[in-house]
Amino acid sequence: MAKTLTASQAAKEHVLAVSRDFISQPRLIYKTVSGVNGPLVILDDVKFPKFSEIVQLRLADGTLRSGQVLEVSGTKAVVQVFEGTSGIDAKNTLCEFTGDILRTPVSEDMLGRVFNGSGKPIDKGPPILAEDFLDIQGQPINPWSRIYPEEMIQTGISAIDVMNSIARGQKIPIFSAAGLPHNEIAAQICRQAGLVKIPGKSVLDDHEDNFAIVFAAMGVNMETARFFKQDFEENGSMENVCLFLNLANDPTIERIITPRLALTAAEFLAYQCEKHVLVILTDMSSYAEALREVSAAREEVPGRRGFPGYMYTDLATIYERAGRVEGRNGSITQIPILTMPNDDITHPIPDLTGYITEGQIYVDRQLHNRQIYPPVNVLPSLSRLMKSAIGEGMTRKDHSDVSNQLYACYAIGKDVQAMKAVVGEEALTPDDLLYLEFLTKFEKNFISQGNYENRTVFESLDIGWQLLRIFPKEMLKRIPASILAEFYPRDSRH
């Protein structure tokens, strides 16, 4: 039978336990900084330093900074300082080893708040009253207890909903480049995302209380941060949004922990508060460059284009923190945004990201130059989980066939357009001219839509059918006869 203690006995026991632990693991303060290299501080004569241990640094002027032990070699310790190393004086800096890993306070009160890249509130609000302190590396999810994502999220964007459907619990990045409207697309998805409302079928968890957005910005400019903040405030969803902002003028090293803090908050909201969380991470290219900077400071052997050899593993520790877990109603859907340097999809950052994530949404500069919004090029875009999230009972039974046929016609239209540039329009067959007409109308009527235009998946499918009616039935070889008989003769509603 458990022994019951009075309050005073319990307090005494607690003091004994703390002092016992303190004696075996004393929190020593060192003044042995032997060097500073980029974002790293090297300490000598350290007793029992531990890997990933958090170190508190007190500068000569009394400023407090925190860092993490990256490397341990005998009595030497290499500490990465999250707030940067500017102003650190080797003689007068005090370093205290805390004996604990990096944890972040989490609470449902984080919604509606704005934090910096280190997780400290910057919205002039009170500190977070923590319900728990969680390790920012997250809990490993047993693959056996993961649930396959099967509920489609309707984004209201035709090029995504019909051609590259996103399932709840999926991780799908936006591959973009400098100067393209990836922020506007992400904001539109945040505004419009919800479950597909099927007539006659009640969707219980579609109401707003159950939906949250966690937004993490790494190395973005003030304009981008202001754009998202203003957008969330204007559409009234700010009380369901948690923002982590590491701006371009903030320390580079801080970018390493910003996405992990955001995902820890998202995991708490999804698995403890059972909310459906949409995580937007921008810009992953800045994150990878911060990783390269730390790797160079540690003098590690560089990999492709100077990025560290472990970048694939490191990116996976972020992207894999999405999904659904058995026994929990919440989910985490991840939409990382990355800007491809020089529009190069073979660059290591998009290349490795594409291997880990379940598809990608490709934002195209040529479409953007033709004033098409959203400039989503459907041919290199892909959603690997689309097949399980669409069809009868989820969207409509013609969904996958319409999608396949639109893909086929658009691809042939692109080939015809290239051929026309060589041989001229007079040399094209009547069929070729139909494909050219389809190509123009597909980009103008289907891909292109308004910034605030929220099309249901059924409206998008109807627009798809409207375009397919350009062709005679015999040319629509990707659609079964039964589907054609039911949907092809329909009068257009638009």
From Swiss-Prot:
GO terms for biological process: ATP metabolic process; vacuolar acidification. It comes from the Eukaryota. The keyword Ribonucleoprotein does not apply. GO terms for molecular function: ATP binding; proton-transporting ATPase activity, rotational mechanism. Signal peptide: none annotated. Keywords: ATP-binding, Hydrogen ion transport, Ion transport, Nucleotide-binding, Transport. V-ATPase is a heteromultimeric enzyme made up of two complexes: the ATP-hydrolytic V1 complex and the proton translocation V0 complex. The V1 complex consists of three catalytic AB heterodimers that form a heterohexamer, three peripheral stalks each consisting of EG heterodimers, one central rotor including subunits D and F, and the regulatory subunits C and H. The proton translocation complex V0 consists of the proton transport subunit a, a ring of proteolipid subunits c9c'', rotary subunit d, subunits e and f, and the accessory subunits VhaAC45 and ATP6AP2. Non-catalytic subunit of the V1 complex of vacuolar(H+)-ATPase (V-ATPase), a multisubunit enzyme composed of a peripheral complex (V1) that hydrolyzes ATP and a membrane integral complex (V0) that translocates protons. V-ATPase is responsible for acidifying and maintaining the pH of intracellular compartments and in some cell types, is targeted to the plasma membrane, where it is responsible for acidifying the extracellular environment. Essential for the proper assembly and activity of V-ATPase. NCBIfam families: PRK04196.1, V-ATPase_V1_B. Belongs to the ATPase alpha/beta chains family. This is V-type proton ATPase subunit B. It comes from Heliothis virescens (Tobacco budworm moth). The lineage of its organism: Eukaryota, Metazoa, Ecdysozoa, Arthropoda, Hexapoda.
